[in-house]
Each structure stands twice: as C-alpha cells, then as structure tokens.
Amino acid sequence: MSSDESERTVSVKQEDDSLRPKRKKTNRACNHCHKAHMTCDSGRPCKRCIQRGLDKTCEDARRKRKKYLADVPNTALLPNRLQQAETYDGTNASPTESGRSIMYQATTFQHSSTVPISYTNSINDDIYSLGFSKSHNSFLPRNQNQTQPLARSQSTFSQKQSTLPQTHSNLSSSRRTNFLSSAADLEYSTLSSILQDNFMHGNHSTSNEGTPNSITLSPALSPHALTTTVSSNTNTGTATRNMTTPDDLNYTSKRNKPYVAGSSQTPSPQDQLSNGSMEAKARISNASASIYDHQRYPKCDESINQYFLGPTESDQVSMFPDVITAIETMKASDPSVFYERNSKSALSFTIGIVPDDNHYTKNHDSVENESFYKEPEEIYAKVKKPFSYTPGYHSLIAYLRKRFNKPMLVKMAESMAAYRPSFIACTNSLKEGDLIFMEQCFQRTLLTYDNFIRVSGTPTIVWRRTGEIAYVGNEFCILTGWSKEELLGKQRKFIVELLDDKSVLEYFQLFSRIAFGDFLGATMTECTLLTPKTDVKIRTGCMWTLKRDVFGIPMMIVGNFLPIL
C-alpha cells in the first residue's frame, strides 16, 4: 500500500469518528458496566445491558461506603433508596409528605427521652399505613395539607399511636450515643439528622430536626415538653392538629399571654389551649421543685442526671464522697426520685469553675503559698540545700509497720529490694551541688506542671519517690474529701495512706518495675482511694507518670485519678 492510500484511509477514519455522535458521560454506571469497566449511559436498563439481555438486573452499582456514614443503617444506602434521593427534588415533592413527616415525628418523640434517630422501614410502613399513600403526590393548599390527611386517618392513628413510641424506644436504646452534657447530645442528634434526612427521606435540604427551632426536639434536651392538641370540626368532618413548639410555650410570647379581665384583648381558642397547657406545666414544675429540693439532695441537673461537685458561689463545697453518700441515702429513702433520675441518663458528675476571690479558693491558696514557689527566680534563690530523702524513708517504713501484717511487709520489702541498689549506685557519685540542682529541678518541674493541672480538671496528685505528697490539685480534694491542710500540712502524708491494702501492695510492685525500666515511665492501672469517711472508698482508674531528673533517677510521680461509676 502506497503512502497516499494510507493517508487517504486515515482521513476517512477521522471523518467517520467526527460524524459519530459522542457518547454522553454518566455520573454513575450500572453494576454490569461497572464490573466490566465499560462506558455506561444514564438509562436504566442501559443500552449495553439491553443488548446483552441483562436488562432485568441492570441497576446502579453500589458505591464505597463513606466514613461519615458509619452510623447510617444499611437500609438507607440501598441503590433504590439512592436513586429515589437523586430524582427527588423540590419540584416534584409533595407538601403533604413533608407535612406528615413533621407531624408524626413530633408525635413519636413527644413521650420519648431519647435523641431523635432515623426511622426504619417497619416504622415508616406503620406511619404510611395511617392513611397516606407512598405515591401520594397531589398538591394541596398550604392550609389544607395538614388537615385533610388527618381526617382520613384519625381513627387509625389512635390505634397506631400507642405502638409507635414503644417500637421507636426499643430501636433507639441500642443505637443512641450518650454524652455527659445535653449540648453534646444535641449536636450529635443534629448531625445525625442531617445525614439521615438526606439518605432516608430523599431530602437534600439542611434538616433542622433536633434543633431548638424544630418541633421534633426531644423533651430530654428541651426545657419544655411538646404539647399536642387536637380539635375536631363536626360540620366538615376534619381534624386539625396544632403542634405547640418550645418557642410557642415561652411565657414572654405575646400569643401565649393569659387573658386579662377588662382588657380589649380577646383570647382565641388556641390561646386558651396554650394557656391551659402552660398552667398544667407550671403545676408539674412546682411539684418537681418540692421533690428535687437541693437542700435535701445534692445539686443536680435532673435532665441528664449530672451532679455538681466542688465549691459554689455560696462558699459551699460538694465533695464526691458526700454526694455518693447522699445518692445512696436517696436510693434507700426515696427510690422513686432515684430511679426517675437514673432512667433519663447514666450517672455523671461535673466540677464547677469558681472565681479567684471565692472563700474555698483563698483557703487552699494560703496553704500552697507556704510550701510552693510561684516564680523560677524564687526557686533558684531560696533552694540552697538538697532535699533529705532519708527521714522520708524512715517515716514510710514506720507507717507500713504499724498498718500492715508481716506477710504483706515481706512482699513490699521484696519490691523495694529490686530498685534499692540502683538508687544507691546512682546517688553515690553525686556531689552536694548535684543534689541541690536536683531539688531545684524538682521544684521547677512542679511549677511547670502546676500551670497544666490547674486548667485540666482531672483529679491530680504529685508525690516524691519516697511517697511523700508534694502537690495536690483542687479536683483531687473534691474527689476524695481530703483537704490540702491535711495532705500538705506540717505533718506530710504519704500516697500509701490514701490507698487501701491491696492498692498499696500493687503500688510497690508497679514502682519497682518502672523505676529503672521503661524510660517513659507511664502506666495505667486501677486502685481504691480512701476518704476521711472510713465507710466510703472510691474505686478509680488511674494513670501514673514517672518523671526522672537529669541524672536518670526517679524524681516524682504524677497520678491522675477518675472514679469508676
């Protein structure tokens, strides 16, 4: 073949390609084209599947599950659901469908203490069976889209209403994520509602479910419960469902002001119903105030079962052992109050932040000022002699002999014998200047840690390698009930005095392993803390961090404790 003929053939092929219509790209291929890596079209079934006889099984290929959809049920991500969501927009959406979704979701959560979650197919079927058709797309005027469907399903709704909350509560109990604050619960429910509305109901607009402006807000997260009133019209045979939102129950709202005799204002039927519901709520709140008397029981946020610890503005201090004792007393003397609070949420505690001029803060700062340096220059100027660890060891041995029997003392001595030779070998070569520098490093490190401990909110205590307590955080005093005067006074206490017998033995065994073992020196364990009340012991999870000086010798142990509830 000559060059002219080859060029002519190439030109003919190019002309054919230019005349051939370009195939449009599709956003999503079908399952068969996706497996074969072939170009697909937007039709279902696509042309390629029709030619191959696979038109009956041609559907959108499943996409990889996104990480942010981890808590969305699988039924919400089926291809047919996604296809409906893609074809569903504001132009073909029915006002009655959006209206029924709002009305019945609010009804379901009216007597529920859980965060709103997505419906499953079974609940959706129950809702649609109340007289609504899934394919019902007829347009109605805005003032009729909530009245006519209810007229057709009023009798059926009364039968189904009692079963929906029970079914929903069973599903929500296994899927709800609990947080220790209503703010976190509300934020989580809002984010979940956005995802679930987009994929389950085909709604691509931002959902406000679970927010203060939404009528589907859970009563557990709202200061007011939702009120639903039904008024019937015998002439037309229609029922109107008036949803009262938390905003509608505001006492400062003009619409809900009570009627004043002699005024020109005439109360409407809606105002009368709203005022009646507010009066009922006022009676309930007054009864609750008499039951949940803070003078009788510790201060508590009853909506999330969270008790307040620490100092208050009235210079009253709520210690953890006192609150635990009060809760046990409540459980024995007033079980109805106890079980009502615990049925709402798991038991939790919070520590308040008080101003610096509080009486409690001033007393604790006065104790710290006597034995704690505030500036680095003060450390280098006043620390002129080494810290003597010998009296501390003698006092520790004397205390252990008074408290423990001989078998336990032998086990403790075995643990001490494991690290004692290493201590002697490391300190023999140190001069007096080195020992002074070692103490300066201790105080300087303690000053640095104080800045973090004050803002951490975690009960923290610091002790030397001998076990002598050197620093105590305010939260640790609130947790155990010990005061800083008792722990940091002239007669210093040892950390073993705050632990029960088993925890003391475990402490020495653990210290012998990390003293010259892992250089990081951090470990997690459990221990039982003793309180000034001999009958109250606190089981805690603790994190012990061993800090070494420049010579590699264990200098201090930082202990963080959290109660196991």
From Swiss-Prot:
Q: Which residues form the PAS domain?
A: 445-518
PROSITE patterns assigned to the protein according to its UniProt record, in alphabetical order: PAS (PS50112), ZN2_CY6_FUNGAL_1 (PS00463), ZN2_CY6_FUNGAL_2 (PS50048)
> In what ranges is there compositional bias, type Basic and acidic residues?
1-20
Q: Where in the cell is it found?
A: Nucleus
| Compositionally skewed regions (Polar residues) per UniProt | 262-277
Record region (Disordered): 1-25, 139-175, 227-279
Residue ranges for the DNA-binding region feature of this UniProt entry: 30-58
Q: Where is the composition biased (Low complexity)?
A: 227-245
Q: What is its main location?
A: nucleus
User: Could you give a GO molecular-function term held by this entry?
Assistant: zinc ion binding
| CC terms in the record's Gene Ontology section | nucleus
According to its UniProt entry, one GO biological process term is: carbon catabolite repression of transcription
InterPro entries reported for this sequence: ERT1_acuK_gluconeogen_tf, PAS, PAS-like_dom_sf, PAS_13, Zn2-C6_fun-type_DNA-bd_sf, Zn2Cys6_DnaBD
Q: Which family does it belong to?
A: Belongs to the ERT1/acuK family.
User: Which PANTHER family did the record assign?
Assistant: TRANSCRIPTION ACTIVATOR OF GLUCONEOGENESIS ERT1 (PTHR47659:SF1), ZN(II)2CYS6 TRANSCRIPTION FACTOR (EUROFUNG)-RELATED (PTHR47659)
Q: Indicate what this protein is called per its UniProt record.
A: Transcription activator of gluconeogenesis ERT1
Q: Which organism is it from?
A: Scheffersomyces stipitis (strain ATCC 58785 / CBS 6054 / NBRC 10063 / NRRL Y-11545) (Yeast)
